[in-house]
Swiss-Prot record:
<dbReference type="Pfam" id="PF04749">
    <property type="entry name" value="PLAC8"/>
</dbReference>
<keyword id="KW-0812">Transmembrane</keyword>
<keyword id="KW-1133">Transmembrane helix</keyword>
<protein>
    <recommendedName>
        <fullName>Protein PLANT CADMIUM RESISTANCE 7</fullName>
    </recommendedName>
</protein>
<dbReference type="InterPro" id="IPR006461">
    <property type="entry name" value="PLAC_motif_containing"/>
</dbReference>
<feature type="transmembrane region" description="Helical">
    <location>
        <begin position="49"/>
        <end position="68"/>
    </location>
</feature>
<comment type="function">
    <text>May be involved in heavy metals transport.</text>
</comment>
<comment type="similarity">
    <text>Belongs to the cornifelin family.</text>
</comment>
<dbReference type="GO" id="GO:0016020">
    <property type="term" value="C:membrane"/>
</dbReference>
<keyword id="KW-0472">Membrane</keyword>
Amino acid sequence: MEKQWTSGLFSCMEDSETACLTCFCPCVTFGRIADISDEGRTGCGRCGVFYGLICCVVGLPCLFSCTYRTKIRSKFGLPESPTSDCVTHFFCECCALCQEHRELKTRGLDPSIGWSGNMQRTMAPPMSQQMMG
């Protein structure tokens, strides 16, 4: 049974900070999503720069970004909706990036601190407690 996205494709303003960042600098949002989706193997900066190059040279960043939507869907068992991943990114690039970013945040992963930051946060040793006497 497929789970559902935790927010709609057009619910960008549920996280206005990410919506503004994505509107003016989608390469940063994409880099963050890619870093989490690839579990830190590719890095935010590298993917963000590659996204920017595709944007400038080809003009179709959706050719690259839709593959990360597929990764997120596979990881969390989400439906390919409202249309295929490539069509969603082609027509609604910023909305798709915002939805993916929100999905990661809702599932406990903070894209703004990257994969390694999330792993450090998850695996942080407990604070030592001392008795006051």
